[in-house]
Amino acid sequence: VCKSTFSYNAGLAMIRRTAESDIVRLRKYEIPIKRVARNLCLDPALIAGIISQESRAGLLLDNGWDQGRQKYGLMQIGRQQHQLFGMWDSEEHINQCSTILVLAINEVRARHPTWTWDQQLRGGICTYRAKMGNYQVYEEDPCDRDDYYVNSVIRRAQY
């Protein structure tokens, strides 16, 4: 019991520390994030939370690419799945990825109309990440068993 409590609390502290340090880098993108969020009816904090989780607001990127050169940009779009638009840190890139997020959320809402909004949002975030939406049963986090990705994005969005 103590070990899992410690791990959970340590994880929360780590997310808080990284989110706080990412806020400084995210300020550079505040205006494009807010513009995209307004146009797509998204909470700008959700976009910022994904940017923080995926690329640490650009800190983890090499000229816009992840280490394996498979994902691109602040929101880490896979080059196999999508045509890339704009520079890695541009409003165009943020708009492209945020549009994919909105489509993912709407797909989950259509497939699971009885889910709560929180469940649909979590499923949409997961679908954005995993590029899949084949959920038959809702669990705490359909992304993975330890709830890490979706919970991390949501917690980062709260900072």
What are these regions (language model features)?
Residues 1-11, 19-27, 38-40, 68, ...:
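Non-catalytic cell-wall polysaccharide-engagement segments
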Residues 10, 34, 38-72:
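Secreted/periplasmic proteins that engage bacterial cell-wall peptidoglycan
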Residues 30-31:
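A generic alpha-helix surface/boundary motif
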